[in-house]
Design a protein with these regions (language model features):
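A generic structural motif
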Residues: 30-36, 141-142
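Helix-loop-strand module that forms the ligand-binding subsite of alpha/beta enzymes
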Residues: 61-145
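N-terminal beta1-alpha1 ligand-phosphate binding loop
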Residues: 2-31
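N-terminal beta-loop-helix "entrance" segment that forms/cooperates
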Residues: 37-60
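Cofactor-binding loop segments of dinucleotide-utilizing enzymes, especially the Rossmann-like FAD-
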Residues: 9, 40, 118-121
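Mobile beta-alpha loop/short-helix "lid" or hinge segments that flank ligand
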Residues: 39-46, 137-148
């Protein structure tokens, strides 16, 4: 059975981003895909400090949800990252998480499919999609494309 990890970067547990994530969960489950969703937008996640600990040990020096996500990410066949748009950018907590998650994990990501979900009142979606999809591109992960 295929597995997908969804990282919800919204600080609002029942906001618009969560509604979009729940819709994706339903579609995945209807198609026999195992889904694990983690809400990180309301967590205290530090940014990378470039200490090199992950290069030496394979895990981040900060023992928080990022190290837990690393194991889930390695097991998953796909990764969905979801975020509200703040000033044409993803939530800063999500970016800190993704910076550390992608930098500290050394497994091959080339066959893991990536997808981004963004929610905005007005503009900024294109810039935020670009910001999030670069994690997939840099890791040679195929992305699911942009659906609006």
């Amino acid at each position: 059975m295929a597995k997908v990890l969804i990282i919800n970067g919204s600080p609002r547990v029942n906001g618009n981003t969560s509604i979009a994530v729940r819709e994706m969960e339903n579609v995945f489950q209807e198609n026999g895909v195992e889904v694990k969703t983690v809400q990180i937008g309301n967590k205290d996640i530090r940014g990378c400090i470039a200490c090199g600990h992950c290069y030496e040990t394979g895990k981040c020096a900060f023992d928080d949800v990022v190290n837990e996500l690393a194991a889930e990410f390695e097991e998953a066949d796909g990764l969905v990252v979801a975020s509200p748009v703040y000033y044409a950018s993803a939530n800063a907590t999500l970016i800190a998480c993704l910076d550390r998650l992608f930098y500290s994990t050394h497994f091959d990501k080339r066959m893991k499919v990536g997808a981004s979900v963004v929610c905005a009142r007005r503009g900024g979606c294109s810039a935020t999609f670009d910001e999030l999809n670069k994690y997939f591109t840099i890791s040679n992960m195929p992305d699911s494309g942009i659906w609006q």
